[in-house]
Structure formats: structure tokens, C-alpha cells
Amino acid sequence: MVQEYDVIVIGAGHAGVEAGLASARRGAKTLMLTINLDNIAFMPCNPSVGGPAKGIVVREIDALGGQMAKTIDKTHIQMRMLNTGKGPAVRALRAQADKVLYQQEMKRVIEDEENLHIMQGMVDELIIEDNEVKGVRTNIGTEYLSKAVIITTGTFLRGEIILGNMKYSSGPNHQLPSITLSDNLRELGFDIVRFKTGTPPRVNSKTIDYSKTEIQPGDDVGRAFSFETTEYILDQLPCWLTYTNAETHKVIDDNLHLSAMYSGMIKGTGPRYCPSIEDKFVRFNDKPRHQLFLEPEGRNTNEVYVQGLSTSLPEHVQRQMLETIPGLEKADMMRAGYAIEYDAIVPTQLWPTLETKMIKNLYTAGQINGTSGYEEAAGQGLMAGINAAGKVLNTGEKILSRSDAYIGVLIDDLVTKGTNEPYRLLTSRAEYRLLLRHDNADLRLTDMGYELGMISEERYARFNEKRQQIDAEIKRLSDIRIKPNEHTQAIIEQHGGSRLKDGILAIDLLRRPEMTYDIILEILEEEHQLNADVEEQVEIQTKYEGYINKSLQQVEKVKRMEEKKIPEDLDYSKIDSLATEAREKLSEVKPLNIAQASRISGVNPADISILLIYLEQGKLQRVSY
């Protein structure tokens, strides 16, 4: 008997688990198929979650009802807030994961999720009827039927590991690759590209001389990604910093001809922002040294990840490199680094919901869409799961805008601009980064998560209480006038401020650069009554109010452009006035509104003006079929 589901998820990596959980949590009967049940949420590369921009994505996933934040909060070995000396727009949390515990915890969550079924199996083929997906067929001929399918195959599609002059079919960490499914996507007409990524050697902790390295401890205060976490792991393990040197670079230079990167063996495009050590040596040969972070892979293993030493050089050369690095001279290499090539689809073949334009009800998420990173994958998986379930259950899909979330920036970049290399999310990619902060992800997205059925009533009530406390405290400080008495003047001067000439509202005093919420309470002779996250919001929203309001005005302008919809089936070849390049790009991307059209590379303001004229005159309808 053929089994039927609402949604099938192919793959159980970081995109797959979020897709499966989101679909199930929205009420869809969901099946997750994966090559190996023991590798659910596996971390084949760095054992970490978060960092600049990426850490904010993890907070956004949590605010929308996803899982990654909760799981890393329970299984990390270290957590640090980055960029604390800078403004709130670029602060981000980063955690070192216990990669085995992370996998185990995520597998437990998936097994306990109602509506989510998991099965070990390799999908070889999609079942398609009239350009609509109807299910999948495995390598042993088993068929599973569904109303929607989400492909989250990571780097497994026609995966090939490259090490020196060796090249062989493999998924990450020497797992089985998925070859036939990649061929099936080509046969269906998808435009496929070849990308490459890599990983460094792992060494035995017992053989490292840590006295020659610099300790990198975690923060000594409780940190968490999830807004629901209340218990913090304070027993943390340190990381360690060391460097390459002239000796290391000589080993690389002497053996560069053996690197698959430079021998011509690697055809795929590698990630610009995570280059291999040989690539760094060639591109930045004026630098006398490069940072290397020694990151423990967990509490119950001796394996240490040498962050920054990603390489495809032969194993014996990797050993020679390690022997030149302070602290690693006698290190025992437990796993060699390698490069991996894999297939990805050109992401402009997707709608902003992550549904493919070519095949109805077929979605893709994660590295198959050309991204790099666990967090980028998880964010896409979450949205694909939300949208696939919403479509088949008729409960609504959701497109995050660039002003809603970094996840919105990520997806819009992919489907509007595409990518010719593994895409990494950066704070510089977000034009509204002062709005898209680590601290306010819940204020931006919890309402949305609740409307989508991803947030419980209890959690939503707590969130609303927090929001009301923030608003009430800002109003309270706006009504309190501080007198310029000696008590006040002494505290202000003590903190580097200039004396008051007249009375001032507490909220206006807080706007001064040297003032903090703590100092205001000291002046008012009050005790702390609110949670730290509420106080943080009061301070940030007050100090940056002018900048935030400017950003919100820009958002409103874009929203007006987003309201100018473009029919999906518009035939741009009928609009004679458009430039040839614009016509080609618009036909490829099929933007849903004028705002998206304006972000397409090759579409200039004159082309947008022509589209606007057609919209206003109603001519778009006459050239649509």
C-alpha cells in the first residue's frame, strides 16, 4: 500500500529538520526521508552556530517558532557575544557546539514531534504529473505520495570529495552521495551549477601544546539564542588561537601544484568568505600570518577542529603544515581536511516562497539553493516548511521582506539576484540592519510566528507582557523630570557627562551617549524592577530612535513599491520600450512587484519607470496571457 502525506522533506540536515518541524507544527502530515538516520542535523564542517548576521538568523528562527536556537542552547560548550564594543546593529551571538549532543538532541525533538514521521531512505526520483509534484520514489523503488515536496539535500547532490590528486563520489564526511536525484532534476529542466566547499583537518586535543596558543574563553554570563531559554550552561570549554607563519606558507608554496584548487581538478566555485588556506596564501600573500582557531568538537571527544585551515592538499602535506604551527608541532591528525564539490540549482528558478517556478508544489531549501552555512540553511528550511504546509492546507504562505528579517534578505538575494558562488549572509547585505538586530528579533517576528500557528498561547502571552513593559517604561521615563540638584550633577559628572543647566526629562537624559539605563535608575534612586532584556530595549529604542525612524521611513517607501504588483505570467517580450538585458532578466526572475524588480541586476531605473507607466495605465493586463 502506497503511503500518502501532505508534505515530504528530502534530507535531514539543518534545512531539512527546520522544514520538517515547521510543516508538522503547522498541522501537515509530514514525512522526512534521509540517507542515514544517525546523521540528522550533522555538522560536517565547523562545530559552531551563529556569528555576525548568522547569529541573528538563529534568533529569527526562534522568534518564528523554529528549533535551532533551543537545541544549541542545550548542547553548546561555549557561547560569546561578538562586537560588544560596537553598536547594536552588528552585535551577534556565537556558540561552539557539542556536535554529537546537538545531533542527538535534534533527533529526539524530531522523533517526539506530532505529525512528523522519519524514514531512512535515498530518494532517486520525483513523481511529477502535469508539472506538479505528486511524491517521490526511492532507490529501492518505494513510492511515497504527497501534495508538496521540499528538497534539502545539502552538499550530497553528485557530491565528490577531493584530496590532493584523489577524487571520488561521496557526500560530506564520506557518506553516500545522491547522484540519481541530481540527474532527475537535470532531466526535469532545472539549471544546475557546480559549487565547492571545504573542511580543515581535525587534531587530537591530547597532543596540542596549548601553552603556545592564546586562550579564547566564553562569556562568564549566561547567554542564549532562544527567547524561551531560562537555564544557562556556565560550565564552558575554551577555544584557542594560534597562527600560521612563514614556515607554514613555504610548505603551501612548495606543494601548491598538488592542491586540487590549483591543479584544475576542482571545477566548482568555492566560497569567497571562507577560502581554503592555499587560497588565502595566494590571494593575500602579503600577509605574514593567518589566524587559526582551535575549536573542541564536544565534551566527550578529543577531536579539535582547526578553524581557518580548510584545505584540499594531500594528507602528508597537511601533516607538514601542522608541524609548522605553534602548539600543533606534535599534533596527531585524526581526520584530514578535504574539499567537496556538489550540485546546486540556480536560485532565480524559485519564487520568494522557495517554491520552484517550473514544478508546482516543489520547494528547495539550504545548500541546494547555493548558500553556505548551517544558519542560512535552517532559515530557508523553516520558511519552506511554513510555506509548503500553508499551501497544501490552505492556511497561508509567508514571504519575509528585507525589512522583516535577515532571512528575508537572504531569500530575496537568492531569488532576485541569484549567486555565482556559495552565498554567505553578511550584515553588509542588509540595508535595514539597524532594524534587524539580535536584541529585537522577537519584537519583529513573534506576531508573525503566532499568526502562522508556530508560537504557543503561553509563549505569546509572555511576549505581549514584555512588549507592554517596554512601552510602559519608555512612557514613564518620558513623564519624569530630573532636577539639576547636586545628587544628579555628581552622578552625571562621575560618568563623564556635562552638568545640567536646567531640569531634563529622564528619557532625554538617557539619549546622551554616556548615559545608560542603569545610570538613570541611580539618579532616580530606584532599584531594578524589570528584566534585563526589557531594560536593554528601553535603552536601545531611546538612544537610536532618530536613526530607527529614518530607517522606518525608507521601509515605507519600499512598501509602497511592493504594493505595485506585477502579474506572474507577464510576457515582457511584448513591452517594446524595455532594454534587452532588462527584458531577459525580468523574464528569468519574474518579480512579483516593482520593489523586487528594482533589485534585479541589469534592470535600471529607466526600465522601472516603463514598468510603472504600464502599471498605472493598465497596459500590463493587456500584454499578460
Curated annotation (Swiss-Prot):
Compartments where located: Cytoplasm
HAMAP family per UniProt: MnmG_GidA
Name of the encoding gene: mnmG
One of the record's GO cellular component terms: cytosol
Keywords recorded for this protein, A-Z: Cytoplasm, FAD, Flavoprotein, NAD, tRNA processing
GO biological process terms, semicolon-separated: tRNA methylation; tRNA wobble uridine modification
Family of this protein: Belongs to the MnmG family.
Function per UniProt: NAD-binding protein involved in the addition of a carboxymethylaminomethyl (cmnm) group at the wobble position (U34) of certain tRNAs, forming tRNA-cmnm(5)s(2)U34.
Subunit relationships: Homodimer. Heterotetramer of two MnmE and two MnmG subunits.
Organism from which the protein derives: Staphylococcus aureus (strain bovine RF122 / ET3-1)
Protein name, entry field: tRNA uridine 5-carboxymethylaminomethyl modification enzyme MnmG
Cofactor: FAD
